[in-house]
């Protein structure tokens, strides 16, 4: 797993407001300055009182006190020398009493009034020098440039249209001077914003240091026993939280200091670029625009129907004050145009919060440039009253506005004109943009309506039946009257009101009013007093930002509040206040929610959020049934984030005993990213338990509702408080101070999922010991956490058990498992407080369906359902899980009962520092023992005879098969997670550890016997089934293995041939076929010759044995002559023919017949020998003939003279040609 490294993109709300000099910025810095003046006044009066009143009075009181204690009892000197009966001890008693009482009084005085070292005064001085003085210096610079800028701007715009002011060169010079002053003013504003953020943190730091100065005096160390007694332990714990919080904030500010400087520089650079004036003289010529009219075009082209961004800024507004006579004045107002709505903001009379007037749709407004107005850059807005249908004089309002420059004048008129053009081009009247363009929106709350007494402000501010009194609305359904008035008076600290990016005098009221606001598709005063005047919708990070347009397009424009929600009766009042703040912060700035999700806040806690390994921020977290909402606001930066609970795999708290890291919660997402949260002012174990419960609840098939969740949370809080009280009562007074008893606390989450106090190393030693004691064991490694594997194996939806058991009949309807039942022993031991037990039901099948039971006689166990128990005996969350199964008693013929116990151990792989490697080992331990009888399970049989040893070997084999099946099914489950250890997916697929809500308390004996033995009887018939199965199994195994080997050899050969080039393969095939053909012919010729030779040798050896044989060669011509002569004698000689016809010749007939047969055989052999001779000489002779023939052809063609003159050569060549033709005619 890895941590996210990409840094967050924070929102610079305060800096952005300072760069635009918005009314929100001015109101916030003015209100903060009033608070700082009060703080400064308090500090000076306090220091003056301490130095001039407290110290002299304290010294006088000390002297009076010492005098009183010295005279409280007689002097020891007076009591000595036989003046009292107990002379050895009474004077000493008086002396010690006087001294101890004086010490006690000094200690008490130090607790109440402080010490004489003036640490409190030093802390005040440090606050003044480190924070207050730098702030006032920045404020003084800011006020200087603000007055300079406002006065110059007023004088510049107050100039009339005389000849000198109309000169372009003069306008350019004045504009450049204004920009230079505004640059200095914006820079001072950004510096002041930074000083305010630092001041806030330093003030918190001062308060902590001051409280700690006083708190240290509340710790008393006894003189004799040296025991430490803390008089205010609750204050000590709270102060510890505050100290850690401040230290984290200071670290955050130190890390953000460079980012803040970069943000200031970037914003200042952007502001300068935005207000950079033109250097062209013609751009300052007012005469060129005097005749320009910005009228709406009659025809609107769809090609120009493009979305326009909004516009906002300061404008001077012409108005009158007084009654008789009326005096014309020009007042500065913040005007805006957004989402086709035009409105005006103004500062309150006290200049400490923002007010608003009516807002008008752009279709009711007509803009006109006023070149004849005495002042420069003026234009008129004519706003028609939507409620009037005529064109009379009193049906509209004329507002004369003055821009600060000619560029702003053009920008305002062009923007107003283009927005109206776009609104008119909308054909659908139900389009939300068109609906907004035709609306008139009165102030929703009287508290934020404009209170200015000028005539134009009064005309622009109206009220209707929709205008509400915020205080009364909150009283009705949401808050108590005392809390509302405390909010109005800024005394609502008991409500834990969160800090907003902009803080004005009415920020708290605005925070609760946003909950009732109708819509935020346009700026309103409540948003201006919390988030400022800018549109931060695209950067709220709750959903994907809008693309391509800043104009929000909701489905409809509703007149009812999108925040409204009816709180149920079971919802606590404290959470109701938190929920209102939550909705205001997260959804008032985000327009992507037409209706705010109806999720109620179930938990709120302060934290230091570490979203990656580079950043950490002080934040506030709101938890609903489905999400965690994180909000941060520090040092001018803000951020909103919504985290889906299903995206989080697990939440664990840091196991380190250090008090800083003990606040840490580790959260791991499904994509492997990991982030941390340090919880403050709330027990982090309770937070971790609640978050983990919500994660698992969301993954359930039927999750619990908000009411059930709140009930569970309440029970958890009550249990934690009770346990804290018990722990405190059991600790001594000295331990209350010296020991972090909160670290001893275990939450309900730990109780349900952790039942041992043993350390991981002790549990690892236990695992090794059990492995040594086991008869056999198997171990596998999995690349997931131990908790994940535990759910996979033993979750209530997991099918690993009982289907993986060797004795279970696969696919039977009787196979199921029950919920886990929590059993607490009446007498708890130190190592285990409770156990979880469940029952596995399955149908017994001792031959795994290989031989059908219908073919055999059934006994008592066939088709019998068994109930096997599993018991979780050791749980160490995230490290170690131990489950026992059994016992099972198996009875074989002619053998003692065999007792079988199985133990599953899941152990996390950890480093030497105790850090998890996100790997775990699964060990399956089998223990076999022959016992004397079923009633004597503890009596072990030592001497085993042959059958019992054979059965043990069988059992070992079946254990291997069962282990392989468990391993296979487990890995099948893990493959479904795609190598992502996401706890939500694990829970969805494998279920929870479904623990029943009720707990049974058993005595030690009964709890130990909770798992009754399962008895299985194997008779001779059953064993014959098993033997048959094994025989067939082994024979099949041999056949299959042989087939596998042969198939593997064929595949290897095929693979080798498949790797050869195809062209080469085809050539080799053709060559092999050709060679086989010639080899066949050679073999045929060889055997023919061999046969003739054998026949001749047999004849010669048989008839002429023992004689001298004379060999004579016979050529082919001789053979032909011999044959021909013999035929002539036989056929043509008339003498021999007549002799043959004579009757005397019959006596030679038999002899002649034999001779004829011999002759036929000899001729046949001669013919064979002739062919053999031809074959022997034919090859070489043919080559010679071809060579000679080629020479003859060459001579005939090239040496023609020689050919003509040499007749012998011609005869020889003709003989060669004839012989070549004869040989060519002979079949091969």
From Swiss-Prot:
GO biological process: intracellular sterol transport
Classification via Pfam families: PH (PF00169)
Ranges in the topological domain labelled Cytoplasmic: 1-1062
Domain VASt, first and last residues per copy: 773-978
InterPro entries reported in the protein's UniProt record: AH/BAR_dom_sf, PH-like_dom_sf, PH_domain, Sip3/Lam1_BAR, Sip3_PH, VASt
Signal sequence coordinates: none
Residue intervals of the PH domain: 308-421
Role this protein plays: Involved in mitochondrial fragmentation during programmed cell death in response to high levels of alpha-factor mating pheromone or the drug amiodarone. May be involved in sterol transfer between intracellular membranes.
Entry's family note: Belongs to the SIP3 family.
More details: Present with 1170 molecules/cell in log phase SD medium.
Domain notes: The VASt domain bind sterols.
Name assigned to this protein: Membrane-anchored lipid-binding protein LAM1
Organism of provenance: Saccharomyces cerevisiae (strain ATCC 204508 / S288c) (Baker's yeast)
Recorded name of the encoding gene: LAM1
């Amino acid at each position: 797993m890895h941590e996210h490294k990409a840094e967050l993109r924070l929102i610079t709300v305060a800096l952005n407001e300072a760069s635009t000099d918005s009314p929100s910025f001015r109101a916030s810095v003015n209100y903060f300055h009033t608070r700082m003046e009060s703080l400064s006044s308090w500090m000076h009066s306090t220091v003056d009182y301490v130095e001039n009143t407290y110290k002299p009075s304290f010294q006088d009181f000390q002297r009076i006190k010492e005098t009183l204690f010295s005279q409280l009892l007689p002097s020891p000197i007076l009591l000595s020398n036989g003046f009292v009966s107990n002379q050895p001890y009474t004077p000493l008693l008086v002396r010690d009493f006087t001294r101890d009482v004086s010490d006690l009084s000094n200690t008490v005085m130090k607790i109440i009034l402080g010490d004489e070292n003036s640490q409190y005064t030093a802390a005040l001085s440090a606050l003044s020098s480190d924070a207050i003085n730098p702030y006032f210096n920045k404020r003084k610079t800011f006020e200087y440039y603000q007055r300079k800028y406002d006065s110059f701007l007023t004088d510049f715009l107050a100039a009339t249209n005389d000849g000198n002011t109309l000169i372009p060169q003069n306008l350019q010079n004045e504009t450049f001077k204004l920009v230079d002053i505004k640059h200095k003013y914006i820079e001072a504003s950004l510096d002041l914003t930074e000083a305010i953020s630092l001041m806030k943190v330093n003030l918190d730091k001062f308060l902590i240091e001051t409280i700690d100065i006083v708190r240290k005096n509340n710790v008393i160390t006894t003189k004799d026993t040296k025991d430490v007694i803390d008089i205010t332990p609750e204050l000590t714990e709270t102060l510890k939280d505050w100290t850690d919080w401040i230290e984290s904030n200071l670290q955050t500010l130190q890390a953000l200091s460079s980012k803040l400087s970069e943000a200031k520089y970037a914003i200042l650079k952007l502001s300068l670029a935005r207000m950079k004036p033109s250097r062209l003289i013609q751009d300052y010529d007012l005469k060129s625009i005097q005749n320009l009219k910005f009228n709406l075009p009659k025809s609107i082209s769809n090609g120009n129907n493009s979305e326009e961004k909004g516009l906002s800024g300061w404008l001077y507004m012409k108005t009158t004050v007084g009654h008789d006579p009326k005096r014309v004045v020009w007042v500065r107002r913040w005007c805006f145009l957004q989402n086709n709505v035009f409105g005006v903001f103004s500062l309150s009379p006290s200049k400490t919060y923002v007010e608003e007037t009516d807002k008008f749709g752009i279709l009711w407004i007509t803009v006109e440039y006023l070149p004849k107005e005495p002042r420069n850059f003026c234009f008129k807005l004519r706003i028609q009253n939507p409620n009037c249908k005529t064109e009379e004089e009193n049906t509209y309002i004329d507002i004369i506005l003055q821009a600060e420059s000619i560029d702003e004048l053009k920008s305002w008129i062009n923007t107003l004109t283009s927005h109206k053009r776009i609104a008119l081009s909308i054909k659908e009247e139900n389009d939300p943009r068109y609906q907004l363009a035709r609306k008139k929106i009165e102030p929703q709350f009287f508290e934020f309506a404009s209170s200015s007494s000028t005539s134009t402000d009064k005309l622009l501010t109206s009220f209707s039946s929709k205008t509400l009194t915020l205080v009364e609305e909150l009283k009705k359904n949401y808050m108590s009257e005392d809390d509302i008035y405390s909010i109005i008076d800024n005394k609502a600290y008991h409500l834990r009101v969160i800090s907003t990016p902009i803080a004005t005098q009415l920020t708290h009221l605005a925070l609760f009013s946003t909950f009732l606001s109708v819509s935020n598709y346009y700026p309103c005063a409540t948003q201006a007093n919390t988030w400022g005047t800018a549109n931060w919708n695209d950067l709220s990070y709750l959903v994907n930002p809008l693309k391509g347009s800043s104009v929000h397009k909701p489905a409809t424009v509703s007149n009812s509040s999108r925040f409204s929600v009816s709180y149920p009766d079971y919802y606590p009042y404290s959470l109701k206040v938190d929920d209102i703040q939550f909705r205001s912060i997260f959804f008032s700035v985000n327009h992507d929610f037409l209706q705010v999700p109806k999720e109620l806040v179930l938990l709120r806690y302060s934290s230091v959020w570490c979203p990656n390994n580079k950043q950490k921020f002080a934040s506030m977290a709101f938890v609903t049934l489905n999400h965690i909402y994180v909000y941060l606001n520090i040092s001018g930066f803000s951020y909103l984030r919504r985290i889906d609970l299903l995206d989080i795999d697990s939440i664990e708290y840091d196991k380190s005993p250090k008090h800083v890291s003990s606040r840490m919660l580790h959260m791991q997402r499904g994509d492997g990213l990991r982030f941390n949260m340090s919880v403050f002012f709330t027990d982090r174990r309770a937070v971790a338990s609640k978050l983990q419960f919500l994660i698992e609840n969301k993954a359930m098939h039927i999750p619990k509702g908000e009411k059930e969740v709140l009930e569970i949370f309440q029970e958890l809080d009550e249990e934690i408080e009770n346990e804290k009280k018990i722990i405190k009562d059991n600790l001594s007074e000295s331990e209350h101070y010296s020991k972090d008893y909160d670290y001893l606390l275990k939450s309900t989450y730990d109780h349900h999922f952790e039942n041992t106090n043993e350390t991981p190393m002790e549990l690892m030693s236990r695992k090794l010991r059990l492995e040594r004691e086991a008869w056999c064991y198997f171990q596998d490694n999995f690349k997931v956490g131990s908790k994940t594997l535990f759910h996979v194996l033993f979750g209530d939806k997991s099918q690993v058990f009982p289907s993986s058991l060797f004795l279970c009949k696969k696919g039977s309807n009787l196979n199921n498992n029950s919920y886990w039942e929590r059993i607490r022993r009446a007498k708890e031991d130190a190592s285990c407080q409770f156990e979880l037990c469940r029952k596995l039901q399955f149908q017994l099948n001792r031959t795994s369906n290989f031989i059908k039971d219908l073919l055999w006689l059934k006994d008592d166990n066939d088709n019998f359902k068994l109930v096997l128990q599993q018991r979780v005996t050791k749980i160490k969350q995230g490290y170690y899980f131990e489950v026992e199964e059994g016992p099972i008693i198996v009875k074989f013929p002619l053998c003692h009962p065999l007792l079988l116990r199985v133990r599953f151990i899941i152990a996390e792989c950890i480093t030497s520092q105790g850090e998890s490697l996100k790997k775990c080992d699964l060990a399956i331990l089998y223990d076999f023992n022959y016992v004397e009888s079923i009633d004597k399970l503890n009596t072990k049989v030592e001497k085993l005879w042959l059958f019992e040893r054979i059965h043990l070997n069988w059992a070992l084999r079946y254990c291997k098969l069962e282990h392989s099946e468990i391993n296979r099914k487990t890995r099948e489950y893990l493959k479904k997670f795609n190598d992502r250890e996401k706890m939500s997916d694990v829970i969805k697929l494998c279920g929870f550890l479904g623990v029943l809500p009720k707990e049974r308390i058993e005595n030690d004996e009964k709890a130990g016997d909770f798992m009754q033995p399962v008895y299985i009887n194997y008779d001779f018939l059953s064993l014959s089934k098993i033997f048959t199965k094994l025989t067939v199994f082994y024979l099949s195994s041999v056949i299959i293995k042989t087939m596998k080997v042969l198939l593997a050899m064929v595949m290897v050969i095929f693979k080798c041939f498949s790797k050869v080039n195809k062209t080469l393969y085809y050539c080799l095939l053709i060559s092999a076929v050709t060679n086989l053909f010639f080899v066949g012919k050679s073999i045929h010729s060889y055997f023919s010759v061999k046969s003739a030779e054998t026949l001749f040798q047999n004849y010669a050896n048989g008839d002429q044995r023992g004689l001298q044989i004379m060999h004579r060669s016979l050529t082919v011509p001789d053979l032909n002559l011999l044959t021909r002569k013999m035929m002539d004698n036989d056929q043509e000689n008339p003498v021999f023919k007549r002799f043959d016809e004579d009757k005397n010749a019959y006596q030679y007939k038999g002899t002649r017949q034999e001779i004829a047969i011999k002759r036929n055989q000899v001729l046949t052999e001669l013919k064979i020998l002739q062919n053999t001779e031809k074959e022997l000489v034919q090859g070489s002779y043919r080559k010679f003939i071809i060579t000679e023939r080629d020479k003859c052809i060459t001579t005939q063609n090239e040496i023609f003279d020689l050919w003509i003159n040499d007749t012998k050569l011609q005869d020889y060549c003709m003989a060669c040609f004839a012989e070549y033709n004869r040989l060519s005619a002979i079949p091969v």
